[in-house]
From Swiss-Prot:
The keyword Thylakoid applies. Keywords: Chlorophyll, Chloroplast, Chromophore, Membrane, Photosynthesis, Photosystem II, Plastid, Thylakoid, Transmembrane, Transmembrane helix. One of its GO terms (biological process) is photosynthetic electron transport in photosystem II. GO terms for molecular function: chlorophyll binding; electron transporter, transferring electrons within the cyclic electron transport pathway of photosynthesis activity. This is Photosystem II CP47 reaction center protein. It comes from Trieres chinensis (Marine centric diatom).
Length: 509
């Protein structure tokens, strides 16, 4: 009998040996993809400028996840932080990628073995000789092992007790590096931006999982609960597993999009809310004001701003600016950033300082408007010059640059002032190389946007998968046919009212 494509998994429904085989093959595919993708990214990655051309600008997807776990060095002699390294060993990008590919090959061979040798004594009930799995016991084993792994990650890897630690950075993503993290056991551990919570929660969840696993290994479920939740049905396992996966996908979609200690901006790029709230702009202004209050000139104050911090304050790095269906890395949009030109300050002929109103995230075009400190519009680039009152030419706007490549330079000609006013709409002003990658000028999203979009969609699909398989396993007896007790109810002439047990007729002799 031929099976339609959506029914092919029926063949492993009552075949534990081959159920293991297909799971091993799935693990082989996942590990093989991860290792191969890492090697591909390493082949195209340019490590020369970690400040203005970081991995998230280049569209790296696997590398940020490797880096946040403590992998920073390459066999090519470079490091994510820009330093040169020698003999990084196995704990390197290439070493971990190759170990995944080797694991993939081993799982592939194991899958073939289990497919061929599917009928093992292990899978048969010794009392009946029938294929049978003790699913509650298997659940306990898995829970115990995953708890052990969770505890080990939190207690050893993250804390640096036996491992490198994780990627930790400051609130503005400037000073990040891999370092050991002490667990935060207080209320502060629940702050999503506190890396100490990662260590504490893995330790706590791991201990809980270990004890829960031991409980399920030693305590049998009550018969009523066993039957109510269909604990003997393999499709119950599928349904609950899908629930765990879609829940994890929903949670990580949130931590990725809104930001968290687990998704540092140095590795995944800034969040859209940091642009929306002027997060970096406010910090830059605070640092400049502090420097000026210390006696530095405005030019010196702006020169102290790190290029890395200024680059975050640019709309092209906002993951919400790139359309979801614009393929390619951010660098294919606006180009490869080469230099910060500095902070432009505009002035009209009366000497008033003017600020260009910044473009909101969801606008493709936005009027160029220059306002004074009170928010009053003093200049603009008009749509119709014939009716203009506040044009750059009429108001006599000039622009001075502080910090960056154009530090100390002043521009007075209207075309140049307009050019920089348009650039200032997008945040801090940068120089881009658009020829090397044939960049088209259309913004792209960062790996942060792609991850969120993908996992939110997968979570939704898996949610429906959970409902589907949960419904199938709970109502299995209804779907598989009519039971013996139902036959009497619907027998013609047995009841005055069909199917109503209270109207049973007296049998004639």
């Amino acid at each position: 009998m031929a099976l339609p494509w959506y029914r092919v998994h029926t063949v492993v429904l009552n075949d534990p040996g081959r159920l293991i085989a297909v799971h091993l093959m799935h693990t082989a595919l996942v590990a093989g993809w991860a290792g191969s993708m890492a090697l591909y990214e390493l082949a195209v990655f340019d490590p020369s400028d970690p400040v203005l051309n970081p991995m998230w600008r280049q569209g790296m997807f696997v590398m940020p996840f490797m880096t946040r776990l403590g992998i920073t060095d390459s066999w090519g002699g470079w490091s994510i932080t820009g330093e040169s390294v020698s003999n990084p060993g196995i704990w390197s990008f290439e070493g971990v990628a190759l170990s995944h590919i080797i694991l993939s090959g081993m799982c592939f061979l194991a899958a073939i073995w289990h497919w061929v040798y599917w009928d093992l004594e292990l899978f048969r009930d010794p009392r009946t000789g029938e294929p049978a799995l003790d699913l509650p016991k298997i659940f306990g084993i898995h829970l115990f092992l995953s708890g052990l792994l969770c505890f080990g990650f939190g207690a050893f890897h993250v804390t640096g007790l036996f491992g490198p630690g994780i990627w930790v950075s400051d609130a503005y993503g400037v000073t990040g590096k891999v370092q050991p993290v002490a667990p935060a056991w207080g209320a502060d551990g629940f702050n999503p931006f506190n890396p100490g919570g990662i260590a504490a929660h893995h330790i706590a969840a791991g201990i809980f999982g270990i004890f829960a696993g031991i409980f399920h290994l030693t305590v049998r479920p009550p018969q009523r609960l066993y039957r109510a939740l269909r604990m003997g049905n393999i499709e119950t396992v599928l349904s609950s597993s899908i629930a765990a996966v879609f829940f994890a996908a929903f949670v990580t979609s949130g931590t990725m999009w809104y930001g968290a200690a687990a998704t540092p901006i140095e590795l995944f790029g800034p969040t859209r809310y940091q642009w929306d709230s002027g997060y970096f702009q406010q910090e830059i202004e605070r640092q400049v004001e502090t420097s000026v209050s210390e006696g530095l000139s405005e030019s010196q104050a702006w020169s102290r701003i790190p290029d890395k911090l200024a680059f975050y304050d640019y709309i092209g790095n906002n993951p919400a600016k790139g359309g979801l269906f614009r393929a390619g890395p951010m660098n294919k949009g606006d180009g490869i950033a080469e230099a910060w030109l500095g902070h432009p300050i505009f002035r009209d002929k009366d000497g008033r300082e003017l600020t260009v109103r910044r473009m909101p995230a969801f606008f493709e075009t936005f009027p160029v408007i220059l306002v004074d400190k009170d928010g009053i519009i003093r200049a603009d680039i008009p749509f119709r010059r014939a009716e203009s009152k506040y044009s750059i030419e009429q108001v006599g706007v000039t622009v001075d640059f502080y910090g960056g490549k154009l530090n100390g330079q002043t521009f007075k000609d209207a075309p140049t002032v307009k050019k920089f006013a348009r650039k200032a709409q997008l945040g801090e002003v940068f120089e881009f190389d658009r020829t090397s990658l044939e960049s088209d000028g259309v913004f792209r999203s960062s790996p942060r946007g792609w991850y969120t979009f993908g996992h939110a969609n997968f979570a939704l699909l898996f949610f429906f998968g959970h409902l589907w398989h949960g419904g199938r396993t709970i109502f299995r007896d209804v779907f598989t046919g009519i039971g013996a007790e139902v036959t009497e109810q619907v027998e013609f002439g047995a009841f005055q009212k069909l199917g109503d047990k209270s109207t049973k007729k007296q049998g004639a002799v």
